[in-house]
Amino acid sequence: MTPIQKTATVGGKDILLETGKVAKQAHGSVWVRLGDSIVLVTAVSAAEKKEGIDFFPLTVDYQEKLFAAGRVPGSFFRREGRPTEKETLTSRLVDRSCRPLFAEGYSNETQVIATVISFDQENDTDVLALTGASAALHISDIPFGGPIAGVRVARVGGQLVANPTLAQRAEADLDVVMAASRDAIVMVEGGAQEVSEAVMIEALLFGQAAVQPLLDAQDALRAATGNKARRAFEPPKNDVELRAKVKALTWEKVKEAYGRNEKHDRYGRLSEIKKELLQALKDEAAGDAAKLATIALREKEIKGYYEDVKYDYMRKMITDERRRIGGRGMADIRKITCEVGLLPRVHGSSLFTRGETQALVATTLGTAEDEQRVEMLTGMVFKKFMLHYNFPPFSVGEVKFLRSPGRREIGHGALAERALRAVMPPEDQFPYTVRVVSDIMESNGSSSMASVCGGCLSLMDAGVPIKAPVAGIAMGLIKEGEKIAILSDILGDEDHLGDMDFKVCGTAAGITSIQMDIKIGGVTRDILEQALAQAAEGRKHILGEMAKALSAPRGSISAYAPRITTIKIRPERIKDIIGPGGKTIKDITARTGTSINIEDDGSVSIASPNQDKVEEAIKMIRGLTQEAEVGRIYLGTVRKIAEFGAFVEIFPGTDGLIHISELSDKRVKSVSDVLSEGEEVMVKVISVDRSGKIRLSRKEALADSAKKSEGTEPPKGEPAK
C-alpha cells in the first residue's frame, strides 16, 4: 500500500496524518505528527464477539517510549516500567472520548494502542494520541461513529491558543484538553487559575472550532483508503412485545422503589423487582416447557429491558415531573457535614460527608526529600504536591481484593489534585512537600468531589496557607427535545442518566478544575452557560457549609510536622557544607537530627519537628559559610604568632591577619608582648582583598568598643553588635 498523507492546520501549525507506511497488519494505523513530535496509533478488533458480557470490551493504552526524547530509562533493567500517571490519564482521555461512539451492541474485543515515538520538547503528544485514535478507527472496518479530534486550549496573556507549546502552557492561566466532533464537544479535562465560567465556555467553543480541519483530514484519509465498509455484527435484540410486557410488569414498582431515599433500601427493592419480574414470566409460562426454556435462554435480554425501564422512568421523572430521588429539586444539594482535626497525630485531617458519600482525608507535610520523582519525556520531574484517592470496596458494601490503584482511582485523584494545586502557595513561601490522601468511607455519587472538599479542609487544618478554599460539585444534564433538566450534586443512580455529565471545582472567584463528558449534539452556548451557572451556585453553597467547620488555614502547622527554615548562602560555599564525600553535612544531620536539602542556587532548607534543633543546625551552617564583613567587629581566637603580626580565626575555617602595627595605638616591639596563641581577642575587619585575604585590626576594635556605652563583647565567631 502506498503511504497516504493528509494535513490539517490547527493553531497555525500543521498536523500530519499518515497511513500505509507502518503497522499495516493492524485494522487501522495512523502516524500523527506535530512539529517533531510523532505518535503511532493502531486499532485492532477481534473477529468474533466476546460472549457473556454486558459491556463493550475496549482497551486503550497510551505509552511513551523514552527513546522518543533521546533518553535511556533510569530503571535497573533500563526498560520502561509500569505506566506513569500521565500515561494512565491519557489512556483514560482517549477511552472516554471514543467509547461512546462505537455502535451499540458491538462486543468484539477492541484495542487502541498509542505509542509516542518522537518528542520535540515543545508539542505535547496526548492530543495527538486522541486524534490518532479516532483516525485509526475511522479508516478501519470497526463500527465506529467518528470522527472526533483532540485539541489543547490554553489562555496565555489573555489570548486563547490551540495546541500551545510547553513554554506557553507554563504561562497559561487555563489549560484544557478536549475532544470534539462536528456538532458536539465530546470530552473536556483541564484546569485553570480561578477563571470565570464565561472564559471557560469561550475556551470550549474555541476548541471545537479549532478541530474542524482535523475532522476534514480524517474524512479525506478514510476516502483515500477506500472507505472500508463497517463490519457486520449482530445488533442487540429488540423484542417490542417482550419489552412492553417487562414495562407493564415493573413500571409502577420501579416508581415506588425510586421513592425510597436510602440507597441500600432502594437497591434492595430494585433487585427484588427484577426477581419478581422473572418469576412472573415463569408463572405465566407454567406448564409450557418450551416457553420456560425460552425465558431461561433470554434472561439476560429480559434483564436488559428491565434496566431500560429504570432508565426511562428516572429520565421521565426528572424531565416531566421535575422530581429527583429523595424528593430533591434540580439544584438541591444533599445535607453536608464537615469535621476537621479528628486524627490527633496527623498533620491535617478532615471528614467530609455529603448525603451518603463520605471522604476521610489526611494531609502530610514533608521535606524536599519526600518529593515524588517521575521520569518523563521532558526529563526528571519533581512533584511537591500530590493527592491520592482510594476507593475501598467497603465504601459501597462490596467484597473485593485490595489491589494497587486502578485507572479510575488515578483519574479521580488527578482531578482533585488539579483542583487544589491552583490555590497552593509558592515554594518560596511554603517549602513543604504536601501529600493529601482521600479514603472514601462510603459512596453514593460524587466521591471525587468529596475528595476536593475534604482535601481543602484537610490542607487548611494542616496550616497550609492556600490562596482560597476550594469546593467541587458533580452535575448532570438531561435533554429530551426542548425539555432540559440540569441536576446538581448527582447520585450514583443519576450518574449514567445524563446526556452531559460534568464536574466543576473552584473557589468563590472561579474555576480551578473541570471534567466533562457530553454524549449528545446540540448542547448550545446557552445550555453550557445555564449548566455552569448552576454549578457555580452549588459550589458556593458547599463553600459556605465548609466554612462552618474551618473558614481559613490555621495560623501554624501541626506540632508533629517538620519545621522548615530556609537560609541563603553563596553557591560557591555549598562545598563547605557538604564537605569531602558528604562528611560535613552528614555530621550536621547526625548531631542535630535534622534533614538538610541544598539547592544549586544556594538555598538551604533545614527541617525538624524540633525548632531548637533547626536553629542549632543553622548556627553550624552559618559557622561554615559566613564571610568576613568589612567594618564588623568579631571575637576571634589567636591561632599563630609571627614576627609581623598574628593570625586570628574569627569564625570556624576563616582566619585573618592582624599586622603588628594594628595591635595597639602605641608602639609594639613584639607581637608576643600583646597576644599569645589560643587567646581570644576583639578584632575589626578593615579589608578583604580579591583573593579573600582578610586584614584585621585590634586597635580599631578597641577604639570602637570604647565608644559604645554598653561595652558588651560579641559572642565568639559572631559580629559585634
From Swiss-Prot:
GO (cellular component) term, any one: cytosol
Source superkingdom: Bacteria
Domain KH: 562-621
Binding site for Mg(2+): D495, D501
Molecular-function annotations in GO: 3'-5'-RNA exonuclease activity; magnesium ion binding; polyribonucleotide nucleotidyltransferase activity; RNA binding
Cofactor names: Mg(2+)
Any one Pfam family match given in the protein's UniProt record, by short name: S1
Transmembrane segments: none
GO terms under biological process: mRNA catabolic process; RNA processing
Region Disordered: start-end pairs: 699-721
All copies of domain S1 motif, residue ranges: 631-699
Reactions this protein catalyses: RNA(n+1) + phosphate = RNA(n) + a ribonucleoside 5'-diphosphate
Gene3D superfamilies attached to this UniProt entry: GHMP Kinase, N-terminal domain, K Homology domain, type 1, Nucleic acid-binding proteins
Keyword Magnesium attributed: yes
This enzyme's EC code(s): 2.7.7.8
Annotated compartments: Cytoplasm
Cross-referenced InterPro entries: ExoRNase_PH_dom1, ExoRNase_PH_dom2, ExoRNase_PH_dom2_sf, KH_dom, KH_dom_type_1, KH_dom_type_1_sf, NA-bd_OB-fold, PNPase
Keyword Nucleotidyltransferase recorded: yes
Record-stated family: Belongs to the polyribonucleotide nucleotidyltransferase family.
UniProt function note: Involved in mRNA degradation. Catalyzes the phosphorolysis of single-stranded polyribonucleotides processively in the 3'- to 5'-direction.
Protein name per the record: Polyribonucleotide nucleotidyltransferase
Species assigned in the record: Anaeromyxobacter dehalogenans (strain 2CP-1 / ATCC BAA-258)
